[in-house]
């Protein structure tokens, strides 16, 4: 097992959540250090997206704590979690089809975006510059993912959560998204990446957690995961 850096951007302890009577998160604990990139892995139904949704307030937790930068955000409403510096890039991207790229990027932007402005987003994703006047429904899946990430960055987060950013993308676009996430990590932004693409996750992340049936079954560095072939075989289908 490997511990995270002392200063934590995210600290989740013994998180429990239910869907009806189904106990879907059973004491999940994980953390992300300031400026660190961490991946949360597991098969479909393992509880990864539910964990993300419980952190941001879309699913109400029924036990445990969530802290961002030391601030308790347990069971807070989504807008309160966002105000604490958490931004989510949701599964499926959710770009507004009838808005332009520029409008999609800036619709939720903060005036004090924590060092992020439109020019910096376009530096990260230069192909979007020529698409600013295009509608969301005119974009490829990869371009929509870039817009979704850029929109989240313009919130000025201290912690960026990404739910399956490679889903539905061609390999070349997966590589481009990975390049961007590495640059974000190198900029000092803390990342928690939910992903089923193991190659992307281990390329971007410094540490990984593996989930199965609502619990954490492995925590360690990417090198430790690679050395633990039984974990990949049992819980990741590899």
Cite the ranges covered by each PLM segment:
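Glycine-rich phosphate-binding loops of nucleotide-dependent enzymes
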Residues: 2-238
């Amino acid at each position: 097992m490997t511990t995270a850096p002392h200063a934590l951007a995210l600290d989740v302890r013994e998180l429990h959540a239910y869907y009806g009577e189904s106990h879907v998160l059973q004491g999940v604990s994980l953390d992300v250090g300031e400026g660190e990139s961490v991946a949360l892995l597991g098969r479909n139904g393992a509880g990864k997206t539910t964990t993300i949704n419980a952190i941001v307030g879309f699913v109400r937790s029924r036990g445990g704590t969530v802290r961002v930068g030391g601030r308790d955000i347990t069971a807070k409403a989504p807008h309160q979690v966002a105000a604490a510096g958490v931004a989510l890039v949701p599964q499926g991207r959710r770009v507004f089809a009838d808005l332009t790229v520029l409008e999609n990027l800036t619709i939720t932007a903060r005036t004090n975006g924590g060092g992020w402005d439109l020019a910096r987003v376009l530096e990260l994703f230069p192909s979007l510059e020529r698409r600013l006047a295009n509608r969301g429904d005119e974009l490829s899946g990869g371009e929509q993912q870039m817009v979704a990430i850029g929109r989240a960055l313009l919130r000025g987060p201290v912690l960026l959560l990404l739910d399956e950013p490679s889903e539905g993308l061609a390999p070349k676009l997966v590589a481009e998204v990975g390049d961007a996430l590495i640059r974000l990590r190198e900029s000092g932004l803390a990342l928690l990446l939910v992903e089923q693409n193991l190659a992307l996750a281990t390329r971007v992340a410094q540490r990984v957690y593996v989930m199965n049936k609502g619990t954490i079954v492995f925590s360690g560095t990417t090198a430790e995961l690679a050395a633990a072939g039984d974990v990949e075989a049992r819980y990741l289908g590899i």
